[in-house]
Amino acid sequence: MSIRVLMGNIIGLLLLQGRMSGLNIDNKILSIYFHNPCRRVFEECIKYLKDRKYKFLSIDELYSIISKREQVSGNHVFISLDDAWRGNLSNVIPFVERNKIPITIFTPVQPLNDGVLWLKWFRDEELIDKCSDEYPELKRRVPKSLLTAVRNNIWNKLRDLKSYPREIMTEAEIQKLSESPFITIEGHTMTHPILTKCDEWDLEYELNVSKEKLEALLGSPVSYMAYPNGDYNDNIVEACQRYNYKMAFTTEQRMIDVPSDNLYKLPRQCVPNGYGKYESLARMLGLWNKMLRV
């Protein structure tokens, strides 16, 4: 165990012990998300929640509570995973189904075919060096700062030059997961862009065309979505409403406030990989970020 992990565990344990002194959770819902968690991190987090009698909410149950502004008392949690990482099939799904835990997987459509997210190409330094004369903006700008139309032009070139081992689930795997009573597949755009960098045409493609394609794949409605990287603005919220999403999620690090939160700006607290048990739990509960803001 590294010094960093050890110190994080000590701080996390102290934060968890301090939390026991009392916390008003009435009308609050813990909203957490993972990407590609290792089995240990995911299982430790869920076991912690189970031991403390959290009620695990499906996304439909969450929508019903928030849309009706129902009174909520006691511990409630909503769990989601972003991007449909293939590692979820071995590290998450078996545990979820054994323990009957409802989860939502926010799934971008294009990576189901490509096998990886677009950033895989843009973070390949050897590949970028080969293309830097033709696309000098790759050397000057962070990929996420590129307009989506510019990104797409470069991406089409990079995709012809190199392929990678699959990291994201296949269409068939997503279809099979959607048959589980504990797993809901929902929208995460077409290509996982920075939505605030999209023009109106790209926005329609990312939010509406992706929704139609995912619905066709699943044979069922797609009613909810998560903003890639948590980026959104009022124009994107309006587009989600226009394309008949009922609810959308950000990456704002806090609990859901049932009486007041906007259905299209719901927070989620990230549980990243690479940390020890107690730091992971403190991050899941939002205690770590609260400490950093002090």
Give short role names for the model-derived ranges:
Residues 1-80, 86-87, 179-180, 190, ...:
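C-terminal active-site subregion of NodB/CE4 polysaccharide deacetylases
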Residues 32-35, 75-76, 97-231, 263-266:
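Metal-dependent polysaccharide deacetylase catalytic core of the NodB/CE4 family, i.e.
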Residues 89-102, 140-148, 282-294:
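Electropositive, surface-exposed helix/loop patches at the edges of structured domains
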Residues 94, 175, 237-238:
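Alpha-helical segments flanking ligand/cofactor-binding loops in enzyme cores
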